[in-house]
């Protein structure tokens, strides 16, 4: 058996091929797992659990079917879907996790997270993140009419795209000191995260020992998952 990790699907109605690929994954590989962990940015945007978008209902039903089959499903918020709430989690059978979680997997201590908190060189983004994660601001936003939230979200995505176009790739990647600090805080030798869309397995030193950082790929033209078994930790890409 294996535990599976995915992230950064950025599901939206404009990308039906990715949605179809995810549905096949849920009906196939996911059903064989010990557990499924979704490490954020499952959706391209999330403006509230009350959004009647048919895609959201379709995904809730598909994930719930996996959960009902006996495979526990877990979710860590990403920077795109940080407002995903308890209602959708209940409808999809997912358990919401904190932004950093340590798992005991087949004899390994593994830290999992979305990964955006590791990009500490991107000062502008971290300031924005701190602002939009204020509970009072989220409560205020979610109280707005749905059409207003849609307009605000569209404007924020446009601003983010414009800002990122002028940033260096290095700034938008993780900071190595932040990586080591997180791994040493949690006393782990394995870290799995997404966010950067730069799939790779990196070797480093943490806790004065060899350590590994496994980065999930985004689901653009193919699927990406990390498969953890008693024998191995594999970063796997597969066609939709």
From Swiss-Prot:
GO terms for cellular component: cytoplasm; extrinsic component of plasma membrane. Substrate binds at residues 79-80, 122, 160, 164, 167, 195. Transmembrane segments: none annotated. It comes from the Bacteria. It is an enzyme of class 3 (hydrolase). InterPro entries: Calcineurin-like_PHP_ApaH (IPR004843), LpxH-like (IPR043461), Metallo-depent_PP-like (IPR029052), UDP-diacylglucosamine_Hdrlase (IPR010138). GO terms for biological process: lipid A biosynthetic process. GO terms for molecular function: manganese ion binding; UDP-2,3-diacylglucosamine hydrolase activity. Binds 2 Mn(2+) ions per subunit in a binuclear metal center. Its cofactor is Mn(2+). Its EC number is 3.6.1.54. It is a peripheral membrane protein. Mn(2+) 1 binds at residues 8, 10, 41, 197. The keyword Transferase does not apply. It is found in: Cell inner membrane. Belongs to the LpxH family. Hydrolyzes the pyrophosphate bond of UDP-2,3-diacylglucosamine to yield 2,3-diacylglucosamine 1-phosphate (lipid X) and UMP by catalyzing the attack of water at the alpha-P atom. Involved in the biosynthesis of lipid A, a phosphorylated glycolipid that anchors the lipopolysaccharide to the outer membrane of the cell. This is UDP-2,3-diacylglucosamine hydrolase. It comes from Escherichia fergusonii (strain ATCC 35469 / DSM 13698 / CCUG 18766 / IAM 14443 / JCM 21226 / LMG 7866 / NBRC 102419 / NCTC 12128 / CDC 0568-73). The lineage of its organism: Bacteria, Pseudomonadati, Pseudomonadota, Gammaproteobacteria, Enterobacterales.
